[in-house]
Each structure stands twice: as structure tokens, then as C-alpha cells.
């Protein structure tokens, strides 16, 4: 089974077992909803944990796990990653994609390869993709209709029509 990473545990917060997460998932409010199950991976073993509280704090997601009400219960998890089953994903609408489907795709302008999507930034108005280019500076591509012409997640290929000045060097 292929597990999907949804967050990294950055630190603890306070003394009541709250964890500070760096989310790597889309829809964090659904993924970390109270009552949902996430899996903590340690040495290849995936242990289930039930979310008992969720809130946003600055750029972090703050959660507690059921039965873990003290910092001593959770401190050992700092630096570890949280995962979900692929079956936990919901169907998306047309032209909607999960981050894991976009990250790793190769981006092309016509037949010219630009690079590979390495990260997705949420900006509010639209997502922005970071494109890693070998030997060159990264490029930021807005996920808007005027730029992204087509996405083939099966082939891991994205076709764009860059706006003037979007890609330099």
C-alpha cells in the first residue's frame, strides 16, 4: 500500500500534548478533522492515532491525539511524519487535483522541458507551483487557466503557456 504524507510534526506546543504540524496536504481542515485517523510512521511501522482537537495557528496546524494529554506522551514524535490511507481521499471535481498528483510532474512549454513541480504554495487567490530546474533558479508558476494548459497526472506531464517574463534564465 502506498501511504500519503499529510504532515510533519514540527514540535510540541504547551504542556497538554498539543502538536505543531507542518501540513503537506490540501484540505487540512478535512484531513485533521476531529475524529479522523492519521498514521504516524516510525521505522516502517504505521501507528494509527485519532485526532481529538484541531486548530490553525499562524502557518501551523495544531492537533492533539486521543488519549495523549501531556507533553511527555507526544514529545517523542517530534520530527516524524503523519500519513493517511489513499482510500481516505475524496473524489475531486474536474480540473481539481491533490497535491501528491501534481508534485513530481514534469512541466513543458511546447516540447521544451522546464522542470519538475517540487512544491505547491497556497497564496489565497490561486496556488503557485515551484518548478525545480536543473542548474537554474526555480520558477514559480501560478495555477491559473491562462498559464496551465493541460495536466495529465497519469503521465506526470503538465503543459503550460507561460506569460511573458514568467520564465527567465
UniProtKB/Swiss-Prot annotation:
The keyword Ribonucleoprotein does not apply. Signal peptide: none annotated. GO terms for cellular component: cytoplasm; ribosome. NCBIfam families: 16S_RimM. Belongs to the RimM family. The PRC barrel domain binds ribosomal protein uS19. This is Ribosome maturation factor RimM.
